Amino acid sequence: MKKKEMLILTGPTAVGKTKLSIELAKAVGGEIISADSVQVYQKMDIGSAKILPGEMDGVRHHLIDVLSPDEKFDVFRFSQMVKEAMQGIYERGHIPVLVGGTGFYIQAVLYDIAFSEEETDSALRRQLEEEAAQKGNAYMHEKLAAIDPEAAAAIHENNSKRVIRAIEYYMQTGEKISVHNAREHEKESPYAFCYFVLNDDRKKLYDRIDARVDQMVEEGLYEEVKGLLADGIPRSATSMQALGYKEMADHICGDCPLEEAIYLIKRDTRHFAKRQLTWFRRERDVTWVDRTAFAGQEDEMLAFMLGKVDEMRNLNT
């Protein structure tokens, strides 16, 4: 039976996915679904490097600017929203092109992993949240690393919700959440898909990250975060744990000087890019698109990707 088609374009932060994703979507008659856990929020434009309407070049985009910064956003809600978007895309006779660097979210959609909305009144959950409030994110991340090193390597310590969830899962079941996720990952995808991972020379990538952070600061990251705080968005909100926002909020609230905040954003973003690449290397059925192999020529990269799409379609009969 012929499967519905889906394309994925992902890769580490600042690798340059946006322009290529537009060209890919135009070439296949696609609509883009953002797999970015920050661009989904309104008023969080600079720190998320959000695509501007004028850059979309007529390609319809989904899951951008749809939530208030004080709203909860997790893989459960993401999966729901993506399924709704995909239904409309298929009805219009188009192909969904999932674009972004949140590998866990991509995996959930690609393999149709079932998530249920987690209970929020669990006594154990509250106990772990209180422990995190008292001892800090770094302590909880070390606690997870002692239980499940693989999960700790995949989850940033700032993502306290996922760290706590992983510890909670182990304490409730006796099983590492990384083992659970690996088992779920063995499922066959219900889609005919191409899963492209864009990469570049590490030094070039890190230099691009540093330059992007400098540009964000120049464009008004400080003012953007200050505005969010003035709007009453708590520093504990899911949105405010994002890279760039947490560090700048710490500075605004007097916890560190500006120079240190900028240094931490650059350092932690580089670490995040490294973890993203580690995640994608563990994924199966991916096609790596290395900028160095194409000397940075995006037309050649696009032609290579379209060739893979043709191969996928020939097999999907």
Describe these PLM feature segments:
Residues 1-317:
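Phosphate/pyrophosphate-binding catalytic cores of soluble transferases and nucleic-acid-acting enzymes
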